[in-house]
Curated annotation (Swiss-Prot):
Enzyme Commission no: 1.1.1.-
Active site, per annotation: Y54
Binding site for NADPH: G192, L194, V196, I232, R234, S235, R240, S243, N244, R270
Alphabetized PANTHER family for the sequence: 2,5-DIKETO-D-GLUCONIC ACID REDUCTASE, NADP-DEPENDENT OXIDOREDUCTASE DOMAIN-CONTAINING PROTEIN
Molecular function terms, GO-annotated: aldo-keto reductase (NADPH) activity
UniProt xrefs under InterPro entries: AKR, Aldo/ket_reductase_CS, NADP_OxRdtase_dom, NADP_OxRdtase_dom_sf
Superkingdom in the source lineage: Bacteria
Full protein name: Aldo-keto reductase Mflv_4205
UniProt KW Glycoprotein keyword: no
Family statement: Belongs to the aldo/keto reductase family.
Pfam families, sorted: Aldo_ket_red (PF00248)
Species of provenance: Mycolicibacterium gilvum (strain PYR-GCK) (Mycobacterium gilvum (strain PYR-GCK))
Alphabetized UniProt keyword annotations: NADP, Oxidoreductase
Length: 279
């Protein structure tokens, strides 16, 4: 088990700190969510990532409340659903999320998808700025934003997101977008680091795992951490949750990193932000 104190943190561009690894709970049922968050907090996780669109914020809140972990030790992220896009509606949506979570504030609030064809991502960003100003969230950021989406909000608001959460794994290593994020001082947060499970049986990943006496999942998470990303693997299994955080006792070599970097072929397992208009 990894203690919470042993998990490194990164300082965001607003001077708030964020753990470099956390638990994602997308597509988990309420029961799975409560079990996963409970197991994660017991294992030393302090970053929990949910979203209004996941429908499980209340379950996250129940697990947090039952854990006994002090609020100031936690880092809770949730996200704005597309249907709530807009300046005022984004603020109202965060208040509703907080009520479901049973919290007075979140540590990070993200616009879940740009949905630029809807034309509201800039207005939503203004709403997030207001929510930060009044203390409903400590930090604000975006998810699934490409460079031009970032340019839209930064050029009009003169306020830069702290985080850009994107699909990122060896088949989609997002080198170009990571560089854009870095240029703006935006932390890159990787979701889907295991390729939604599709990379666990990849021969190159397994060879590296065998060389280190580690699991394929641990290798994939370690690869992303060594790239400088924040990583939020999703799991409902307490055993895998404990295993996924045990990634600070080994290091991939330059050759192994290069091997995994070389797998990039642009494969997405989640929607393309350029065309997606969902939640």
């Amino acid at each position: 088990m990894t203690s919470a104190a042993a998990i490194p943190t990164v300082t965001l561009n607003d001077d708030n700190t964020m753990p470099v690894i956390g638990l994602g709970v997308g597509e988990l049922s309420d029961a799975e969510t409560e079990q996963a968050v409970t197991a994660a907090l017991e294992a030393g996780y302090r970053l929990i990532d949910t979203a209004a669109a996941y429908g499980n914020e209340a379950a996250v809140g129940r697990a947090i409340a039952a854990s006994g972990v002090p609020r100031d030790e936690l880092f809770v992220t949730t996200k704005l659903a597309t249907e709530d896009a807009g300046f005022q509606s984004s603020q109202d949506a965060l208040r509703a999320s907080l009520e479901r979570l049973g919290l007075d504030y979140v540590d990070l609030y993200l616009i879940h998808w740009p949905v630029s064809q809807q034309g509201k991502h800039v207005d939503s960003w203004g709403g997030l700025m207001k929510s930060k100003e009044v203390g409903l969230t400590r930090s604000i950021g975006v998810a699934n934003f490409h460079g031009h989406h970032l340019d839209d909000i930064i050029s009009l608001s003169f306020f830069t997101p702290a985080v850009n959460q994107i699909e990122l794994h060896p088949l989609l290593n997002q080198a170009e977008l990571r560089a854009v994020n870095a240029e703006h001082g935006i932390a890159t947060e990787a979701y889907g680091p295991l390729g939604v499970g599709n990379l666990l049986s990849h021969s190159a990943v397994n060879a590296i795992a065998e060389a280190h006496g580690r699991t394929p999942a641990q290798v994939l998470i370690r690869w992303s951490l060594q790239l400088g990303n924040i990583v939020i693997p999703r799991s409902s299994s307490p055993e895998r949750i404990r295993s996924n955080i045990d990634v600070f006792g080994f290091e991939l070599s330059e050759e192994q990193m290069s091997t995994l970097n070389g797998l990039d072929d642009g494969t997405r397992f989640r929607p393309d932000p350029e065309t997606y208009s969902g939640s």
